[in-house]
Amino acid sequence: MYHIPDVLSTDQVAEFTRQLAQAEWVDGRVTVGSQGAAVKQNQQIDTRTPLYARLQAAVLDMLRGHPQFFSAALPRTISAPLFNRYGPGETYGFHVDGAVRQNGEAGWMRTDLSATLFLCDPESYEGGELVIEDTYGQHRVKLPAGHLVLYPASSLHCVTPVTRGVRQASFLWIQSMVRDDKQRAMLYDLDRTIQSLKARFGDGEEVLSLLNMYHNLLRQWTEV
């Protein structure tokens, strides 16, 4: 699980908030199967509206230009982002995301990673935590507006009931060029180490050796 900060700037978050106030919202169960529908109580932006098209394009632009997101996800395909909101009493019980999903005209994609981009500051609502279960236990996530959490789509997860205010977010899925979570995590850690060493010492012989190792591993594990 990775915390990706500052996907949106403060000004961009404010603009999203302004536009979300004008959105047309529908029952969030329209995008899930029977298992998810039984535990899902929220609202989503109507994907047939021009406003939705603008907002999802803006999120995609921000993600494609964010180096840390690219390093952590190694995206081959990013789904069209969706937008949800939870008011008082609304929640989404524990569930697992589908292994594959239809991604518009692009066709089917495998869901290796799930991502939630928070669009409200945590002080503006109570409850509404994203709870993610993995082999190390439960992780409760409630990030600042404009920050994103990235986690394996195979994880059981839920959104706890909102008790005050409104929680708004964008959510999406990624098919990675590297399918295996452990391999992808190793590449991410190696890339972060390389970037840190480059910042301190420049492109020395040791850094170039690590960079060579990174690309050889990427070449071995990538599916394109």
Swiss-Prot record:
Residues 77-176 form the Fe2OG dioxygenase domain. Keywords: Dioxygenase, Iron, Metal-binding, Oxidoreductase, Vitamin C. It is an enzyme of class 1 (oxidoreductase). The keyword RNA-binding does not apply. GO terms for biological process: DNA damage response; intracellular iron ion homeostasis. Binds 1 Fe(2+) ion per subunit. Its EC number is 1.14.11.-. The keyword Transmembrane does not apply. Its cofactor is Fe(2+); L-ascorbate. InterPro entries: Oxoglu/Fe-dep_dioxygenase_dom (IPR005123), PKHD_C (IPR041097), PKHD_hydroxylase (IPR023550), Pro_4_hyd_alph (IPR006620), Pro_4_hyd_alph_FE2OG_OXY (IPR044862). 2-oxoglutarate binds at residue 167. GO terms for molecular function: 2-oxoglutarate-dependent dioxygenase activity; iron ion binding; L-ascorbic acid binding. It holds the Pfam family PKHD_C. Fe cation binds at residues 95, 97, 157. This is PKHD-type hydroxylase KPN78578_12210.
